[in-house]
Structures are given as structure tokens and as C-alpha cells.
Amino acid sequence: MSDEQSTPASGRPPRQSRGGLTSTGARKAASKSNRSRAREFALQALYQHLVGGNDVEAIDRFTRDLSGFHKADSVHYDALLRGCINSQVDLDALIAPKLDRTMAEISPIEHASMWIGVYEFQHCPDVPWRVVLNECIELAKEFGGTDGHKYVNAVLNGLAPTLRAAEVEHDRAGKGSAPAQPAAKADTATDAVADAATDAAAADDAADQAAG
């Protein structure tokens, strides 16, 4: 983030950043579901919280004014934003044991992606665990560093057997998926899981249609 985009002393996010965080364009906009868009805006809002410590109401007002927000599932966005911020201590307590470094050493994008994943594992049982995993990998790919998504994958894939135990056990028994990889082996953990998650992604779109 440039000096011009840093958070002002007033605590309100900068007015000039109406385009939000810069995406790599890893996924075409037309292919994104309303919930996928909600996760993207939640990620941007949580980034503001992690970097600037801004008030949640100020962050929310700013984010809702970003271009394209009207295409997002605002209810899901709101649940992720407020749920993650309100539960951040508990979320970090689950994430920290899966890290091979301190929490301060992971990027805000990776941190926010993990928050979203853990929160959805816990509170969104209608979203298959593989969809949650794949969506958070995509968030890290679009907005994070080169290999950040591999780290997000390893941590969330390590937590899924605990937070979605029955679902993961049933899924892996049927498909013979590999066991979860520790964060230190993140470079080898992504491909097989992401491929399987793609098969389940249609469930998230179906949830959008049912909600509509």
C-alpha cells in the first residue's frame, strides 16, 4: 500500500481508494457468484481492520461504497466482516498452532483469508468445506503475494478435519484425498485440494440462487 493510500489519523479509510485492493484478475468477474464477491469485499474490509485498526462501522461504510458492491451478497459480506472481527481472538487461537511462523509474520491478506475460511467452517454449514477452502485460496491468489495461497491452503486444510470433521471424513473416504499438510509443506499442498474444490464450487452458486 502506498503512502498516499495509508489510513489517516481520523480513523476513516482513505476516500481515494474507491477501487479497493488491486486484484490480479485470476478469476473473471463474470464467473464469480454473489457470495464470491461478498468474500472479496469482506477481505478488503478485514484488510483495512488489520492494517489500520479502523472502526468497523467506518470500514463498512467505506467498503459498501466501493465499485461493484451492489453485485455482492451483502448479508454474507456483513456476516463475514462482523463475525471475523468479533471473533478474531478465537479465530487466531485456532490458526496459530497451524503456523510455522508468528502471526505478525503473515501478510494481512493471508491473515484475512484464513479468518474468512475458519469463520465459514464454523458458521456456514451450508457451504461445503471444499468450497470454503477453494474460495479462500482464490482470495489469496487474487489479492496476495505469489505463494500466499499455498500457505492459506495448508492452514485451512489442516483445520478442516477438526472444524468439519464428519464432512471431511466422509468426503475423503469417498475420494481418497490426501491427509492435511502442515504449513511448512504448503508448497505441495494446493493442487489436489484445489482441483477437488472446483468440483464442489457449484454448490455456492446454488446457495446464491436459493437465497435470491
Swiss-Prot record:
Q: Which GO terms describe its biological process?
A: DNA-templated transcription termination; transcription antitermination
GO (cellular component) term, any one: cytosol
Family annotation (InterPro entries): NusB-like_sf (IPR035926), NusB_fam (IPR011605), NusB_RsmB_TIM44 (IPR006027)
Q: Which SUPFAM superfamilies match?
A: NusB-like
Pfam families per record: NusB (PF01029)
Molecular function terms from GO: RNA binding
Q: Where is this region: Disordered?
A: 1-34, 169-212
Please indicate if the UniProt record lists Transcription regulation as a keyword: yes
Q: Where, by residue number, does the polypeptide cross the bilayer? A: none
Query: Compositional bias of type Low complexity: which residue ranges?
Result: 178-212
Q: Which UniProt keywords apply?
A: RNA-binding, Transcription, Transcription antitermination, Transcription regulation
Q: Which PANTHER family match?
A: ANTITERMINATION NUSB DOMAIN-CONTAINING PROTEIN, N UTILIZATION SUBSTANCE PROTEIN B-RELATED
Family assignment from sequence similarity: Belongs to the NusB family.
Task: Please describe what this protein does.
Answer: Involved in transcription antitermination. Required for transcription of ribosomal RNA (rRNA) genes. Binds specifically to the boxA antiterminator sequence of the ribosomal RNA (rrn) operons.
Its recorded name reads Transcription antitermination protein NusB
